[in-house]
Design a protein with these regions (language model features):
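Short, Lys/Arg-enriched, disordered terminal segments
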Residues: 1-4, 123-125
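Hydrophobic transmembrane signal anchors and adjacent membrane-proximal interface regions, especially
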Residues: 5-10, 56, 65-67, 72-74, ...
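Short, compact, well-ordered microdomains
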Residues: 76-125
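Acidic, aromatic-enriched beta-alpha/helix-loop junctions
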Residues: 42-86, 91
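Intrinsic disorder/low-complexity signature
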Residues: 1, 14-15, 72, 85
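Long, low-complexity, charged/polar intrinsically disordered regions in eukaryotic proteins
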Residues: 2-49
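Low-complexity, intrinsically disordered short peptide segments enriched in small/polar/basic residues
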Residues: 11, 19-21, 51-55, 90, ...
Length: 125
């Protein structure tokens, strides 16, 4: 796996009914994929890089977003509304302030060092 890939284990798994298919997500998958340090965040059932995971966040330029330290923009759409609601209820995310970009922000680490209620798990595990 890529050196810039690691996982954050959720303390409480998130269960989503996705078009009559129940999926239990246990990890955030964190990866950087651009020279400017862009971050992608996905939920994944296990410790593997899977193309069918849901990409929840792309932080294309942390500098230009001007969000508070320890936060980054989480881009969402209606297809992910149920999942976003569950992540919100469990305390993994919080709504952005009215003065910020519309959507959600994930915290507390812009650089993916740690998320609230998660423990880091190396990709090699």
């Amino acid at each position: 796996m890529a050196e810039n890939l690691y996982f954050l284990k959720l303390k409480k798994p998130i269960t989503v009914d996705n078009t009559n298919e129940i999926i239990v997500y246990k990890y955030f998958m964190i990866t950087t994929y651009a020279t400017n340090g862009a971050l992608a965040v996905a939920l994944t059932p296990g410790l593997e890089d899977s193309y069918d995971t849901i990409i929840l966040s792309v932080n294309l330029d942390a500098e230009s977003l001007a969000l508070p330290q320890g936060e980054f923009f989480l881009d969402i759409n209606n297809l992910e509304r149920t999942l976003i609601q569950q992540l919100d209820e469990e305390g993994y995310i919080k709504p952005a302030s009215e003065s910020a970009i519309s959507g959600y922000v994930v915290y507390p680490a812009v650089h993916g060092l740690m998320f609230k209620q998660c423990e880091r798990v190396e990709a090699s595990e």
